[in-house]
């Protein structure tokens, strides 16, 4: 689809996919109301910090480290991060903003990342094997989706509002497909369907993805992160080098694992095309994508939105493959609006009595 429908915010574009996916319609006028469905969004009230707690939970045969924001009685939101990226890459301010909307926010480290279980007994695939898919990966995106389902069950969350970024978006899609009873709404950020015909990276970025520098120490890890995010980040927004350095340093302290990264990369490279399955997904869905993403081209997000019936696509001009600070309030508003709408839909669909 080549037609762009401008939102009220001139920096973004929005499409809504009807249930039959036969055509696209323009966005509703104005900003979505984020006060409905029992979710009272108070992103302007920044005085009181959201309650936070750290923990570990057994899930799918491993242990996952997690952190929560907000009160446990609120609608649960689970945030799934991407390749070789730890839960702290979900900015504290974004998590706290969602919590101030009355949501109970859970971020966690995937397997082979941060403080969760590192599967060092499994082989770390060679680059050549990953590229040509010569051998099955040590584990799959489906296995990682099973981790998320185990986290949801282990924390007693029931149905959650699931948010996935990059590879986390792959994982979130598979959770919704393979564990549908655990997902109330689905938000997918800078991700794709698994098809090799859409969402492909630029050659220079692909080379960096396959051969990232192996850091010898904390300082080198920070420098490498700056180099990477200058390559894949958002050209339309100021580059926050101090933030990137701080995040990379804290990630080094929590657990740097190049072999784990290769195992995750193999899982990502080995995933199938989910387009046909996504066409049968019956869950309120939002797809957010940077219109200048050099790692997962916008065609990937558009393909996801076109496949999921009734989904909404929001594309931000100037956004690359990161979460620019200037857009954090936009992300909070969009996610909170979807959770409110999803909660209302769930109450309407619930049988009487």
Segments predicted by a language model, with ranges:
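Conserved acidic catalytic loop of the alpha/beta-hydrolase fold
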Residues: 142-160
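Low-acidity, Ser/Thr- and Arg-rich intrinsically disordered low-complexity segments
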Residues: 1-25, 31
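Alpha/beta-hydrolase
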Residues: 201-276, 283, 303
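Short beta-strand/loop motif that positions the catalytic acidic residue
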Residues: 281, 287-289
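Acidic catalytic loop of the alpha/beta-hydrolase fold
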Residues: 292-296
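Catalytic active-site module of serine/aspartate enzymes centered on a nucleophile-bearing elbow/loop
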Residues: 311-353
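Conserved HGGG/HGGXW glycine-rich cap/lid loop of the alpha/beta-hydrolase fold
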Residues: 62-131
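Flexible "cap/lid" loop of the alpha/beta hydrolase fold
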Residues: 177, 185-216
């Amino acid at each position: 689809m080549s037609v762009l429908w401008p939102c009220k915010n001139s920096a973004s574009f929005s499409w809504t996919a009807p249930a039959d996916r036969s055509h696209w319609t323009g966005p509703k006028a104005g900003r979505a109301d984020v006060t409905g469905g029992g979710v009272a969004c108070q992103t302007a009230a920044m005085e009181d910090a959201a309650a936070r707690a750290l923990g570990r939970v057994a899930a799918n045969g491993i242990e996952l480290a997690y952190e929560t924001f907000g009160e446990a009685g609120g609608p649960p939101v689970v945030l799934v991060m991407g390749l070789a990226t730890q839960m702290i890459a979900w900015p504290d301010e974004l998590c706290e903003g969602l919590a101030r909307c009355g949501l109970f926010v859970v971020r966690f480290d995937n397997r082979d990342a941060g403080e969760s279980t590192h599967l060092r007994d499994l082989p770390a695939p060679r680059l050549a094997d990953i590229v040509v898919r010569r051998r099955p990966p040590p584990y799959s995106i489906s296995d990682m989706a099973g981790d998320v389902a185990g986290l949801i069950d282990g924390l007693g969350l029931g149905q959650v509002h699931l948010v996935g970024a990059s590879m986390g978006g792959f994982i979130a899609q598979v959770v919704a497909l393979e564990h549908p009873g655990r997902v109330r709404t689905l938000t997918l950020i800078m991700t794709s369907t698994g098809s090799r015909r859409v969402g492909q990276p630029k050659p220079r970025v692909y080379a960096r993805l396959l051969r990232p520098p192996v850091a010898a120490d904390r300082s080198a890890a920070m420098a490498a992160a700056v180099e990477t995010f200058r390559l894949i980040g958002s050209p339309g927004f100021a580059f926050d080098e101090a933030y990137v350095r701080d995040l990379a340093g804290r990630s080094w302290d929590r657990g740097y694992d190049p072999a784990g990264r290769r195992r995750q990369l193999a899982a990502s490279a080995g995933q199938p095309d989910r387009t046909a399955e996504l066409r049968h997904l019956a869950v309120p869905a939002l797809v957010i994508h940077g219109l200048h993403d050099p790692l997962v081209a916008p065609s990937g997000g558009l393909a996801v939105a076109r496949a999921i019936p009734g989904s909404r696509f929001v594309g931000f001009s100037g956004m690359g493959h990161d979460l620019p600070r200037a857009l954090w309030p936009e992300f909070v508003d969009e996610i909170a609006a979807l959770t409110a709408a999803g909660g209302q839909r769930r109450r309407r669909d619930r049988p009487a009595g």
